[in-house]
């Protein structure tokens, strides 16, 4: 019997992107059963937590993600197309989000069918 790990994964998080190759290796090398649990990005579920008048937290995440990508030797940039409708200058998140709910739902369905981490 293999070990099971729940992976809470966001389609917008740079950290979810960075960990994906390691998750695939973990599954292959150690017979770990990965259960993908797609979550909505913080920009949608708790935007006031991240996007306040004080932008230092957002600026830190952007710098940290760039440093992490360089350390891992991975290409990194904002997602294109971005699944979140957001002004990247002011970080204002639009009320209407036509993409992320469907995309996250597709991730949930892929996980339900056993194809979450491929």
What are these regions (language model features)?
Residues 11, 17-118:
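Structural alpha/beta surface segment adjacent to cysteine/selenocysteine redox centers
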Residues 2-13:
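Short active-site neighborhood of thiol/selenol oxidoreductases, capturing the structured segment around
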């Amino acid at each position: 019997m293999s070990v099971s790990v729940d992976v809470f994964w966001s389609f917008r998080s740079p950290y979810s992107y960075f960990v994906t190759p390691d998750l695939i290796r973990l599954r292959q090398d150690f017979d770990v059963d990965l259960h993908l649990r797609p979550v909505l990005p913080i920009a949608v579920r708790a935007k006031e937590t991240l996007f306040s008048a004080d932008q230092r937290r957002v600026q830190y995440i952007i710098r940290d993600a760039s440093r992490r990508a360089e350390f891992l030797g991975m290409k990194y940039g904002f997602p294109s197309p971005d699944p979140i409708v957001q002004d990247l200058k002011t970080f204002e998140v639009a009320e209407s989000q036509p993409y992320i709910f469907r995309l996250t739902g597709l991730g949930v369905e892929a996980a339900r069918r056993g194809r979450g981490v491929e």
